[in-house]
Amino acid sequence: MSTVHASTHPLVLHKLSRLRDKNTEPKKFRELVREIAMLIAYEATADLATTSREFDTPLARMTGQELKEKIGLVPVLRAGLGMVEGFWELMPGAEVWHIGLYRDEHTLRPVEYYNKLPLEPRVSVCLILDPMLATGGSATATAEVLKRWGVTKIKYVGLIASPEGIRAMPTVNIDISALEDILIIYVNQLIEELNLSFSNRTLLCYGNVSSVR
């Protein structure tokens, strides 16, 4: 099964509550999305591999650590764009690629309409950024695109998620022996229903999120 990590950090919980408050103004909402994204970026990258390197300090030569894995950010258009800035605060060198999806009105299946991925991946880890994991359709479809592209480690990073969305993620066709290594879902809070006020505010700030579900 996929590993689900729900943040319990007091700052995340505090800011998430303000984010979902119906009285939060759009400008403040955007700021909170950026701030929460930065906080969960710290948690979502806790398992990145590092390697040793030597360098000189003002006093002596020493051995330290640097990231071994290159990271790519994949915001699902358009709602995921609001999370990119928060991640860039911690990893300014991360490359960003965009994948656009919309839901077919007849089949209710996600349809890819935008994909500007390079011919071959230049990173070892891809983080799918999407604030709200609703049915899991767009997240699963994005993961499938990245798998076909050749990425070996994929993580979903979001703000809130529904149980339905969580359950949908294991249906991705992944080698079961490597499931936990390949697909890890990071969310701030698991909710029984999608929060309407959050959806409306996402609509205000990032465009029609229903078009990418």
Can you describe what each PLM-predicted range is?
Residues 1-213:
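PRPP-associated nucleotide enzymes
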